[in-house]
Amino acid sequence: MDNPRRIIIGIDPGSRITGYGIIWSQGSKQGCIAFGQIKTDNDSLNFRLHQIERELRDLILIHRPHEAAIEQVFTFHNHQSALKLGQARGAALVATAACALSVAEYSARQIKQAVVGYGAATKAQVQHMVHLLLQLEKAPPADAADALAIALCHATSSRLSEKLMQAKGTLT
């Protein structure tokens, strides 16, 4: 059975700080390629969104991921924050579309369940598990850890989907 190495970019969008994490995945093994944060300037929102889109597109062109994964929008009590997060998410989706990447979306609960084993895990628990799972020298910043967790969730989820498809093929 052929298990090609896939490169996945995970994106944790935010209007001020957008985290990114790029991993490789082959079979049940994963490793870290790059991670970081896009910290936007204190410009007006349209310039911050453009910066997010431009920097993500540059990262995609440099690292050439095969797939992208992003966190689904969740409900906010603050509607202004929700709107800004949705706009930052839109900028990230435009960057992936410009580079012809397919995008998978996962809820925060799914991501935490996949990485920590508990859907209500704290940010610190996610950060710690990402550090351990990817054998990083030190724990990444919270936004980058979340992005790496999103990429890990996608690697796990897509691997499971492939196995289910293979099993289904042998049953018919």
From Swiss-Prot:
Please indicate if the UniProt record lists Nuclease as a keyword. yes
Q: Give the cofactor note text.
A: Binds 2 Mg(2+) ion per subunit.
Location relative to the cell: Cytoplasm
Tell me which residues bind Mg(2+) 2.
Answer: 71
The residues the record assigns to binding Mg(2+) 1 are 12, 143
Q: Which cofactor does it need?
A: Mg(2+)
Which domain of life does the UniProt lineage start with?
Answer: Bacteria
Among Pfam families, the record links this protein to:
RuvC
Q: Does the keyword Magnesium apply?
A: yes
Instruction: Return the EC number.
Output: 3.1.21.10
Q: Which residues form the active site?
A: 12, 71, 143
Its Gene Ontology cellular component terms are: cytoplasm; Holliday junction resolvase complex
Reaction(s) catalysed by this chain, per the record, are: Endonucleolytic cleavage at a junction such as a reciprocal single-stranded crossover between two homologous DNA duplexes (Holliday junction)
Name one process (GO BP) from the record: DNA recombination
Which InterPro entries does the UniProt record give? Answer: RNaseH-like_sf (IPR012337), RNaseH_sf (IPR036397), X-over_junc_endoDNase_Mg_BS (IPR020563), X-over_junc_endoDNase_RuvC (IPR002176)
* GO MF annotations, alphabetized: crossover junction DNA endonuclease activity; DNA binding; magnesium ion binding
Q: Which UniProt keywords apply?
A: Cytoplasm, DNA damage, DNA recombination, DNA repair, DNA-binding, Endonuclease, Hydrolase, Magnesium, Metal-binding, Nuclease
Regarding protein family, the annotation reads: Belongs to the RuvC family.
Assembly information from the UniProt record:
Homodimer which binds Holliday junction (HJ) DNA. The HJ becomes 2-fold symmetrical on binding to RuvC with unstacked arms; it has a different conformation from HJ DNA in complex with RuvA. In the full resolvosome a probable DNA-RuvA(4)-RuvB(12)-RuvC(2) complex forms which resolves the HJ.
NCBIfam families hit by this protein: ruvC (TIGR00228)
Function (record text): The RuvA-RuvB-RuvC complex processes Holliday junction (HJ) DNA during genetic recombination and DNA repair. Endonuclease that resolves HJ intermediates. Cleaves cruciform DNA by making single-stranded nicks across the HJ at symmetrical positions within the homologous arms, yielding a 5'-phosphate and a 3'-hydroxyl group; requires a central core of homology in the junction. The consensus cleavage sequence is 5'-(A/T)TT(C/G)-3'. Cleavage occurs on the 3'-side of the TT dinucleotide at the point of strand exchange.
Q: What is this protein called?
A: Crossover junction endodeoxyribonuclease RuvC
State the organism named in the record.
Coxiella burnetii (strain RSA 493 / Nine Mile phase I)
